[in-house]
């Protein structure tokens, strides 16, 4: 059974995309409270550069949906250059806000992570992106994860926390 992040007492946690997304979109008061703990230095947070790719894409789609309604992916496919031009400044500002967050360490994805990714996909039947997150977690020695993705529960060494 997963615990909620407000009960997290460890020294470090790895952030999946959902937690920064919830903070930047303002959709979960619990995300703001958790990031306040990080900002105060009560714990260290890690995430991967890969998270920023996922986050930028989700933020872009959310802004398109907010502004135009409908199916944002269909709209983006139909008018990609205009929509990216329109919303990229707002997305970039949000990413910059996150990158400057104190006590948040952004780890690179390295070539050595690919071997861990491949093995994790085989061993735990998880998606490639999530297997790369797992590789980054192993490399920094942080196996506590903030994520709503239940498939991470297939990795016995991880402890998953939710909002």
Model-derived features with residue positions:
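Short, well-structured N-terminal submotif of metal-dependent ribonuclease cores
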Residues: 1-54, 58-74, 140
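Histidine- and aromatic-rich ligand-binding microenvironments
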Residues: 14-16, 47, 126-128, 149, ...
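Anionic, Ser/Thr-rich low-complexity intrinsically disordered regions
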Residues: 43, 86-101, 108-109, 148, ...
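Alpha-helix capping/helix-boundary segments
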Residues: 19, 51, 113, 133, ...
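Active-site neighborhoods of divalent-metal-dependent phosphate/nucleic-acid chemistry enzymes
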Residues: 2-8, 92, 96-144
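Helix-adjacent hinge/juxtasegments
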Residues: 61-93
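Short, flexible helix/strand-to-coil boundary loops that buttress conserved ligand/catalytic motifs
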Residues: 24-25, 59, 121, 156-159
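Phosphate- and divalent-cation-binding pockets in alpha/beta enzyme and binding domains
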Residues: 54-55, 116, 154
């Amino acid at each position: 059974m997963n615990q909620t992040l407000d009960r997290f007492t460890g020294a470090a946690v790895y952030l999946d995309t959902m937690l920064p997304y919830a903070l930047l979109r303002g959709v979960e008061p619990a995300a703001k409270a958790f990031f306040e703990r990080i900002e105060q230095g009560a714990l260290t947070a890690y995430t991967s550069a890969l998270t920023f790719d996922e986050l930028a894409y989700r933020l872009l789609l959310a802004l398109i949906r907010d502004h135009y309604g409908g199916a944002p992916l269909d709209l983006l496919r139909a008018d990609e250059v205009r929509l990216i031009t329109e919303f990229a400044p707002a997305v970039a500002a949000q990413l910059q806000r996150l990158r400057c967050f104190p006590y948040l360490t952004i780890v690179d994805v390295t070539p050595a992570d690919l071997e861990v990714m491949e093995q994790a996909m085989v061993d735990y039947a998880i998606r490639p992106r999530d297997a790369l997150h797992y590789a980054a977690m192993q490399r920094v020695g942080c196996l506590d994860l903030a994520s709503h993705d239940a498939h991470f529960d297939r990795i016995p060494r991880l402890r998953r926390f939710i909002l």
